[in-house]
Amino acid sequence: MKTIQLADAEKLEGTGYTLYRMLNPATVGSKKFMSFVVEVHPGSGIPEHTHGPAEVGLHVLDGEASVTIDGQEALVKPGTAVHVPIGSTIGLTNVGEGALRFIAALSPPIDVSICPVCGIEIREPE
């Protein structure tokens, strides 16, 4: 069994957010999916972007966000799951007073050349 702790995850600092690369081809050898824990500071967001050939699922753990997918906006809070279809454009803003935290799962895993916000360099696990 392969596991990874949040404290040990590769961390990407964006403007107003932190992305923890949890399960992916490099960390656990996954072939069909990758996942992240994402933290967004109050008032900050993640700009609109696409995930190329990947389908995405988001599950909100803490906080509130305004999420826009292909021009449709929704308010999400803890316990909400969001589906992002293949080829869709997504952006979000933390509209709560505290940190927004969510899990993002993508299938298939994508390379950084497709989505610099969340991609990885596809390589074999060490």
Annotate each language-model stretch with its function.
Residues 1-32, 47, 114-126:
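A short, N-terminal "cap"/entry segment at the start of jelly-roll beta-barrel domains
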Residues 36-51:
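Conserved short histidine dyad/triad with adjacent acidic residue
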Residues 45-47, 66, 82, 86-92:
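Histidine-centered metal-chelating micro-motifs
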Residues 54-65:
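Glycine- and acidic-residue-biased ligand/ion/polar-headgroup-sensing regions
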Residues 71-86:
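Short acidic-glycine-tyrosine-enriched beta hairpin
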Residues 86-112:
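Ligand-binding loop in jelly-roll beta-barrel domains
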